[in-house]
């Protein structure tokens, strides 16, 4: 069984972290985030490190222990450095552009798809075939990237569609005569 929860989360320089009962708040150069731990998890700030422990030894408490520690680590990294996810668009005539803050996608449909990002998320289009989603909340950045990819996921025959930059498409062979 993983024991990732045993390791204390170090608070990086330039970030102020505070623990108020179950609520952990982090303030940094990129913004402010908070995480509310489950009642079965105790959170304490000791020697510039956040220590996470289960209240009792139940299986339910131990299962939430490692996740709570990782969530706290994610908010600390988010307010310090932020997160970004890169997407690539492949296909003839498939492209992306920005209209103000909204992302406009030409993906082979009769009309362009217009995506309005939620608050706290920044979308950049360095090239018409590249999209960069960035923000301080790791979950939200991944969710927005997944929603954009969902409009036209990569297909296995030609690889057309929207894919993550690090994603490898398993290609299929076409019909044989």
Swiss-Prot record:
GO terms for biological process: cytoplasmic translation. This protein binds to the 23S rRNA, and is important in its secondary structure. It is located near the subunit interface in the base of the L7/L12 stalk, and near the tRNA binding site of the peptidyltransferase center. Part of the 50S ribosomal subunit. It comes from Allorhizobium ampelinum (strain ATCC BAA-846 / DSM 112012 / S4). GO terms for cellular component: cytosolic large ribosomal subunit. Pfam families: Ribosomal_L6. This is Large ribosomal subunit protein uL6. The lineage of its organism: Bacteria, Pseudomonadati, Pseudomonadota, Alphaproteobacteria, Hyphomicrobiales. Keywords: Ribonucleoprotein, Ribosomal protein, RNA-binding, rRNA-binding. Belongs to the universal ribosomal protein uL6 family.
């Amino acid at each position: 069984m993983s024991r990732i929860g045993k390791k204390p989360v170090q608070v990086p320089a330039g970030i102020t972290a505070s623990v108020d009962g179950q609520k952990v708040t982090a303030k940094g150069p990129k913004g402010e985030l908070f995480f509310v731990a489950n009642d079965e998890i105790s959170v304490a700030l000791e020697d510039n490190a956040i220590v996470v422990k289960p209240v009792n030894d139940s299986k339910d408490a131990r299962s939430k222990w490692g996740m709570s520690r990782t969530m706290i680590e994610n908010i600390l990294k988010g307010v310090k450095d932020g997160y970004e996810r890169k997407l690539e668009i492949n296909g003839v005539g498939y492209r992306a552009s920005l209209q103000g803050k909204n992302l406009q996608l030409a993906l082979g449909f009769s009309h362009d798809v217009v995506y309005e990002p939620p608050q706290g998320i920044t979308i950049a289009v360095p090239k018409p075939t590249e999209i960069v989603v960035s923000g301080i909340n790791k979950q939200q950045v991944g969710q927005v990237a997944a929603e954009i990819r969902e409009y036209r996921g990569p297909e296995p025959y030609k690889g057309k569609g929207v894919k993550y930059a690090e994603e490898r498409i398993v290609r299929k062979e076409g019909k044989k005569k």
